[in-house]
Each structure stands twice: as C-alpha cells, then as structure tokens.
C-alpha cells in the first residue's frame, strides 16, 4: 500500500479528501475511471488544511520565509515564493510522516504552486488560473483547477512510478 499525506492551503484539503474517499471505497467514486488505481493501493495518513505560517511551522517543524503580503491570518506569497514554499512544505511533510507521497499546495498572488514529492521524484507545477488572494480574484476557479490538476498528476505518478493501471 502506498501512503499519502497532504498539507494544503489554497486547495483546502480537497486533494487529500478525494484520494481518501477513493481509497476507502466511497460509493460516489466507484464510477470514476481512476477508482481502481487508488482503491486497494493507496491510503491517506493525513490530509490537512494549513492556511497559516504558524500552523505549518508548528505541525511540520519547518521555518518558512516571511509572507510577501499581509492577509489576515493566512500566509500570502508571490508566485516565485509559492513554488519555494510548496517544495518546503512537501519535504517537511514527507520527513515528518515518512509517507511514500507528500502533496502540498499554496497560493497567494499568482497561479499558486503544488508540489508532489515521491521517493524518486519531485513534481512542481502551478494551477492554470491566475488568482489574487489579497483582492479575492479567481480564488475558487484557481482552487478547482489546482485540485483537478493535482489529482490528475497524482494518478499519472501512480501509473508511472508504481505501475498501477
């Protein structure tokens, strides 16, 4: 069984929850074309929504850079730093939980960033939607796109690295 953990910001834990529901055999997902790849092969150790710098640092024992923008209690970075922070969080998550696959997401101003870290590779990518957390622009569209893109990439990794079909 392949262990997975997520520490998500702009995707609000939805990547991990979707993987968990398929892994556990929720009936609503039985007709999904990826159901048989995940069910019986994957389990979720943790799926966390961590919007704050303090929460991430406390739970994962990692020191993040100072946010580029002030936004209520949440961290908000520019695109370049979102990519850096997604990598840092995925690495900290993998080290802390010793999972096979760690997934992290973060988004402030830009397309956001997602990192999927396996024992063999690091996959870094963004959503296809520009959003601005500070101004509240395209937040839900960016989130939906990020969740779908991360999930599809996760499935491709299962096929490529683990030979699942």
Swiss-Prot record:
Pfam families: HcgF. InterPro entries: HcgF. It comes from the Archaea. Disulfide bonds: none annotated. Belongs to the UPF0254 family. This is UPF0254 protein MmarC6_1720. It comes from Methanococcus maripaludis (strain C6 / ATCC BAA-1332).
């Amino acid at each position: 069984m392949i262990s997975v953990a997520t520490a998500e910001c702009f995707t609000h834990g939805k990547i991990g929850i979707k993987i968990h529901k398929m892994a556990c055999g929720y009936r609503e997902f039985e007709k999904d074309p990826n159901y048989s790849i995940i069910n019986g092969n994957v389990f979720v150790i943790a799926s966390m929504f961590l919007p704050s710098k303090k929460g991430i640092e406390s739970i994962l024992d990692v020191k993040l850079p100072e946010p580029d923008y002030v936004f209520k209690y949440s961290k908000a970075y520019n695109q370049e730093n979102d990519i850096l922070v997604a990598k840092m969080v995925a690495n900290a998550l993998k080290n802390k939980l010793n999972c096979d696959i760690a997934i992290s997401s973060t988004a402030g101003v830009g397309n956001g960033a997602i990192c999927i870290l396996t024992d063999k590779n690091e996959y870094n990518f963004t959503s296809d939607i520009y959003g601005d957390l500070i101004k509240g622009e395209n937040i839900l569209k960016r989130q939906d796109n990020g969740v779908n893109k991360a999930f599809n990439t996760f499935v491709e990794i299962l096929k490529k690295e683990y030979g699942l079909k």
